[in-house]
Amino acid sequence: MKRRLYLSSSSPRRKELLDQAGIPFDLVNAPVEETGLPNESPESFVLRMAVEKALSGFNKVPGKNVWVLGSDTIILKDGKVFGKPKHKMDAYRMLMSFSGEEHTVMTSIAIVNDGAVYSDVCQTNVFFRPISDSEFEQYWATGEAEDKAGAYGIQGQAAKFIEKIEGSYSAVMGLPLYELDKLLRESNFYSE
């Protein structure tokens, strides 16, 4: 019986990465409320979000031999969590706090299959070179900053701000492909 992978996400970057990896998938729309719990650690939060997205998607997909993938990304710097910017000044605050500094991108993935949950969190350290106010203005004008955790996309024009990374490029983009492949193997997605 044919196995199906469903992506419980509206992220164009996650779709692009699955296509790049050659993994056939369908989309399922299953949004969840992304609110932290009292005293929840950033790692626990990002992992819980991926699991909730996968479970929500799994509950909307009928049939057997179904694997549903959920994922979430946050950025952590100096104990603060950075999600998507709410407006231009929020994006400015985020990018200027990364300017000339290191921050950590945490991307979680969860796969739900017949009640079993497989999950992982990938952490990548990203080092930015200093960014000027005029560079921020130019970057903001591209529109890239608006829908991304930390107000930047590594695969876009913000790549010129990144001095180096320690970890997974695809995780910074939104979906750690090595960890995804590992979980798909653990969950017997590839088995005949």
Curated annotation (Swiss-Prot):
EC number: 3.6.1.9
Gene3D superfamilies: 3.90.950.10
Localisation: Cytoplasm
Cofactor(s), by name: a divalent metal cation
Site positions (Important for substrate specificity): 13, 73, 155
Keywords on record: Cytoplasm, Hydrolase, Nucleotide metabolism
Active site: 72 (proton acceptor)
InterPro entries the record matches: ITPase-like_fam, Maf-like
Pfam families, A to Z: Maf
Catalysed reaction equations from the record: dTTP + H2O = dTMP + diphosphate + H(+); UTP + H2O = UMP + diphosphate + H(+)
GO annotation, cellular component aspect: cytoplasm
Class of the enzyme per the UniProt entry, highest EC level: hydrolase
GO biological process, one term: nucleotide metabolic process
Gene Ontology terms for molecular function: dTTP diphosphatase activity; UTP diphosphatase activity
Similarity-based family: Belongs to the Maf family. YhdE subfamily.
Protein task: Nucleoside triphosphate pyrophosphatase that hydrolyzes dTTP and UTP. May have a dual role in cell division arrest and in preventing the incorporation of modified nucleotides into cellular nucleic acids.
UniProt protein name: dTTP/UTP pyrophosphatase
